[in-house]
Curated annotation (Swiss-Prot):
It comes from Danio rerio. Monomer. Solcar repeats lie at residues 193-279, 287-372, 384-472. The gene is slc25a24. This is Mitochondrial adenyl nucleotide antiporter SLC25A24. Its main location: mitochondrion. The regulatory N-terminal domain/NTD formed of two pairs of fused calcium-binding EF-hands, binds calcium in the mitochondrial intermembrane space and regulates the antiporter activity of the transmembrane domain/TMD. In absence of calcium, the apo form of the N-terminal domain is intrinsically disordered and binds to the transmembrane domain, inhibiting the transporter activity. Binding of calcium leads to a major conformational change and abolishes the interaction with the transmembrane domain and the inhibition of the transporter activity. The C-terminal mitochondrial carrier domain/transmembrane domain/TMD bears the transmembrane transporter activity. Belongs to the mitochondrial carrier (TC 2.A.29) family. Keywords: Antiport, Calcium, Membrane, Metal-binding, Mitochondrion, Mitochondrion inner membrane, Repeat, Transmembrane, Transmembrane helix, Transport. Residues 20-55, 87-122, 123-158 form the EF-hand domain.
Amino acid sequence: MHQLIRKFVFTESHCLEEEDNTKSFAELFEKLDVNKDGKVDVSELKTGLAAMGFSMGKGEAQKIVTSGDTDKDEGLDFEEFSKYLKEHEKKLRLTFKSLDKNEDGRVDAKEIQQSLKDLGINLSDKDAEKILHSIDVDGTMTLDWNEWREHFLFNPAEDLQQIIRYWKKSTVLDIGDSLTIPDEFTEEEKTTGMWWKQLAAGGVAGAVSRTGTAPLDRMKVFMQVHSSKTNKISLVNGFKQMIKEGGVASLWRGNGVNVIKIAPETAIKFMAYEQYKKLLSKDGGKVQSHERFMAGSLAGATAQTAIYPMEVMKTRLTLRKTGQYSGMFDCAKKILRKEGVKAFYKGYVPNILGIIPYAGIDLAVYETLKNTWLSHYAKDTANPGVLVLLGCGTISSTCGQLASYPLALIRTRMQAMASMEGSEQVSMSKLVKKIMQKEGFFGLYRGILPNFMKVIPAVSISYVVYEYMRSGLGISK
């Protein structure tokens, strides 16, 4: 892999002499400095390495130049270039040594697996072998120092934590539902405080995303509650009815409480997840995949239990008529006075039951898509790139929604029934029977169209805002 880079930078010796090292860097620098102005800029670095067969991810060339550019002239002169490579090489050697558990000078799949486990990331044997295969040059299924250095010399990742972030499942993609397994943070991220910055960035991204797709979310709830075989509501007619009743601004009814509940739910879920992992683990806090899934599901149930009254208010505010409630507190006051405390937990059972199929299918589909990508395309790099990660996350979340949607519909109808005049208060099982008898199986999927329509814009908005927030909060890639 990358034969020209090996020719310029690497020798057969594991310990390059300082003068040989400098000479190799000088030859590489001359090759990259196409316009011969004595410095290598982002464009030259990217183009030159691509010509040598070294593919770089988005923004990696810029990050290398920014890291090494001490005089801030938007380019690396030879001194800056060689200094960056030498310092980066030292960091890579430390990482390699931390991986090489038995100190035999080679890293195998088991050592990669163990190192990631030490950082709180569980990896299957198959996944570890695939990542190893993507770096292994000589086909021995072990890595020596030269192979490791060759693969990561022009990758701005400086330590194992950054390298493993390629495939860490992130919950930044907010598609409006909160049933996912919480995000996983390494020990370094927890001790440096990076975790709260990532949660804050994700929270802001979710708020903007939900606001941007609120009209479609209101349409989904509207169709879940009011649409039936005898009262078919199309997207166009539904929007016309809502605008006629309350104006364009009415399309955002219920969005305020939907955004406000992000902060407490995220905080409770994260704290509960950490505690459940400790309770379920048998070996000093290191949890297996099934334990992680259980901890995530329990954390989701805990968070939902704590903020569920806000879920009920969101549904009521979304469906309200003009003048019915003056705001969130007025809504809470009227529900409490007319229906009592129990009303704040209507639909709680189907909501909790929906966590298992949603989270389980979300994780299973994500892992399947990830393994498919690794087995077919991870020949030169284990880095999937932004589009692949977004695609995997979107598809897996959508599949999870599809599986749990009937329970979500039952929950919404139970939340709304008490506020609808003349509606009969029934249990979850009776409501399912009633829908099946009157509308058939597809009656459980009323409102699925606007729900799916909001997935792509929601994911896109989440990602763009999250990246801006990462930059603003100084979160490293």
